[in-house]
Curated annotation (Swiss-Prot):
Its cofactor is Zn(2+); Fe(3+). Pathway: Amino-acid degradation; L-histidine degradation into L-glutamate; N-formimidoyl-L-glutamate from L-histidine: step 3/3. 4-imidazolone-5-propanoate binds at Y160, H193, E264. N-formimidoyl-L-glutamate binds at Y160, N337. Binds 1 zinc or iron ion per subunit. The gene is amdhd1. GO terms for molecular function: imidazolonepropionase activity; metal ion binding. Its EC number is 3.5.2.7. It holds the Pfam family Amidohydro_1. PANTHER family: IMIDAZOLONEPROPIONASE, IMIDAZOLONEPROPIONASE-RELATED. CDD domains: Imidazolone-5PH. Zn(2+) binds at H261, D335. This is Probable imidazolonepropionase. Belongs to the metallo-dependent hydrolases superfamily. HutI family.
Length: 433
């Protein structure tokens, strides 16, 4: 391939949102308010799928005069943003829980639904009986919908098996999707999502540490699986702090990043535990303490906040402002699962602004570079900088903020989604403002 030949030139964008200026791996405090944005700019992607140049349109045109491009897109009147990163999802399951929505609207709490045989255990029963082919088809459909909403990198958890064979089945499904779809995937083993029926917490912990994790390590070493992270639901009535520590440490010892559910329904001191263990990320944190926030800021453990959860369960939202002001690396995720059925990171950003008092720049940073950091991918994803993967979202609007501002409007705003310089979604139904 000629050194003067490139896969894609996107030129003349009204706004090109780089997010980062100097290769930052995450943004905190005032950095999140001052995102790097170029006016009338272009971005160039090579045949290897990586960004080769970004800058003012006239400078790029002059610098690459005579170059050949497989595709040229004139983005006049449009805005270009980095592909969005969804840092927390549960997308592999069978059996929706639409019937439980009525229970919640009538006042049932999450744990009341759980104790009545609903919630996670309902989904576990259906997922155990579903074929691998059924689960893969459903996962592919869900990931396609996420891509159409601008997500180009997503964390995908297991956790609706709670026994070795089904957890491995779910991880195989995630691995198959990784190989067959363009969207980037970070795979998380979440066998400690709940205590299986008929077992105690102690028995479940022993099974995970002595049986499940060694098998997953073996399958990963042989190339049959690719698992990146380990997760535990650290919660009253689920896995306590001692069991959580045991499972997370075992996962860390086999090379997995710690990325777990903590301080969601009760203050469990999960934030302290995560900071102590060197966790990459802790999700939820609705009940985090002041000391926990300080500990996370010091340890550079990212807080993956999930406004959809507080919204659907009518919980007090996470204290995003306190975390931001303390210097915590704040990221966002959709928490897509049968309980919180949301594919859309633009809607998550809007909810984060309204419910958690984040600004629009903070929400975008939390859905790009900081979410990538939570998945240990901020060296390759989360901003539009030379050397990073060429993942773009292009919207039909004069300012990038419309992607956050127009609640539920992303389907008419997003014109193109691009991954590694390839068009993975082209929307001919965009409407002018």
């Amino acid at each position: 391939m000629s050194a003067n030949s490139f896969k894609l030139l996107v030129k003349n964008a009204t706004q090109l949102v780089l997010v980062c200026r100097n290769g930052e791996k995450y943004l905190t405090r005032d950095e999140m308010q001052a995102l790097a944005v170029l006016e009338n700019a272009s971005v160039l992607i090579g045949h290897d799928g990586l960004i080769k140049a970004v800058g003012p349109a006239d400078v790029i045109e002059t610098q690459f005069e005579g170059a050949k491009f497989d595709n040229v897109l004139d983005a006049s009147g449009m805005c270009v943003l980095p592909g969005l990163v969804d840092a927390h999802t549960h997308p592999v399951w069978a059996g929706d829980r639409v019937h439980e929505f009525a229970m919640k609207l009538a006042g049932a709490t999450y744990m009341e639904v759980h104790e009545a045989g609903g919630g996670i255990h309902f989904t576990v029963a259906h997922t155990r009986s579903a074929s691998e082919q059924h689960l893969l088809a459903a996962l592919k459909s869900r990931l396609e919908r996420m891509m159409r909403a601008g997500t180009t990198l997503v964390e995908c958890k297991s956790g609706y098996g709670l026994e070795l064979d089904i957890e491995v089945k779910m991880l195989r499904v995630i691995n198959s999707a990784r190989k067959s779809l363009p969207i980037g995937i970070s795979a998380t083993y979440c066998g400690a999502h709940a205590v299986p029926k008929g077992k105690t917490m102690e028995e479940a912990t022993k099974d995970i540490v002595a049986v499940q994790l060694p098998k997953i390590k073996h399958l990963s070493a042989s190339g049959d699986l690719q698992v990146d992270n380990i997760d535990v639901f650290c919660e009253k009535g689920v896995f306590d702090l001692t069991s959580t520590r045991c499972i997370l440490q075992a996962g860390k010892d086999m090379g997995l990043n710690i990325n777990f559910h903590g301080d969601e329904l009760h203050p469990m001191n999960s934030a302290h535990l995560g900071a102590e263990l060197g966790a990459l990320a802790i999700s939820h944190l609705e009940e985090v303490t002041d000391d926990g926030i300080v500990a996370m800021a010091k340890s550079k453990t990212s807080a993956v906040l999930l406004p959809t959860t507080a919204y659907i369960l009518r919980l007090t939202p996470p204290r995003a402002r306190d975390m931001l002001d303390a210097g915590v690396i704040v990221a966002l995720g959709s928490d897509f699962n049968p309980n919180a059925y949301c594919f859309s990171m633009p809607m998550v950003m809007h909810l984060a602004c309204v419910m958690m008092k984040m600004s629009m720049p903070e929400a975008l940073a939390a859905s790009t570079i900081n979410a990538a950091y939570a998945l240990n991918r901020s060296q390759t994803h989360g901003s539009l900088e030379v050397g990073k993967q060429g993942d773009l979202v292009i919207i039909n609007a004069p300012r990038w903020e419309h992607l956050v501002y127009q609640f539920g409007g992303h389907q008419e705003l997003i014109r193109y989604v691009i991954i590694k310089g390839d068009f993975v979604y082209e929307n001919d139904k965009v409407l002018n403002l």
